[in-house]
Amino acid sequence: MSEKVTIKVERKELHLPTIALRGLVVFPNNLVHFEVGREKSIAAVEWAMANNSNVFLVAQKEMETSEPTQQDLYTYGVVAEVKQVLRVSDELVKVLVEGKYRAKLTELDTTGDFLLSAVRSAPVRAAKPEEAVETEALLRALKTGFDEYLGMNPRLAKDVVFTIVSSDDPMFLTEYMPANLLFRYEDKQAVMNENTLNGRLQRLVEMLRRECQVMKIEKEIAEKVNESMDKNQRDYYLHEQLHI
């Protein structure tokens, strides 16, 4: 089952130990820590480490599912290298992984000690020459949207901000931004599911706009609550003063 014995052909299937992720989406070229508690997931990590194999990481559709089948998992995930494993207890392991490349789940075997996936490399299609103008426009819209997002999230990590602001590589940004910004995991998976660069850019632009709209409404609600509290406190103070 080791990945290394598989002939490296672009559309060749690999059979990899698999971890079904709850509320987490891992993208290529990103380092991620997470905890593993299910027996089959721990077994997958241990087998990968013992056999110098990569793993396939794919998100569950429902976090409550304890024993996922193929229908319970999304189709697209990431082939990743296990960089570090720390056993916290008999029932919990902390794992550090690095996403390598996007892959498509074609078959899932749930009968063994761990989940075993048949996967194929699924690179995102770059923009065609005739789509270059659209790509540039989407990239500009993405940068504008991020500027607005940043204005409402001033505590965002400086290294994340610098990386995004200084990069003009759209393919890189469509992996780095969803991996490092506070989007819902369902939204991150929606980006993972997109098969084209421009499709991903469009999805990210929409996500940033939605997040900014939500944050504006949240701010307005908070301001109204504070005004109401201030008024109640003033009324209470005046009421008490009248009784002195």
For the regions a language model picked out, list residue spans one by one.
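N-terminal low-complexity, acidic/polar interaction/targeting segments
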Residues: 1-244
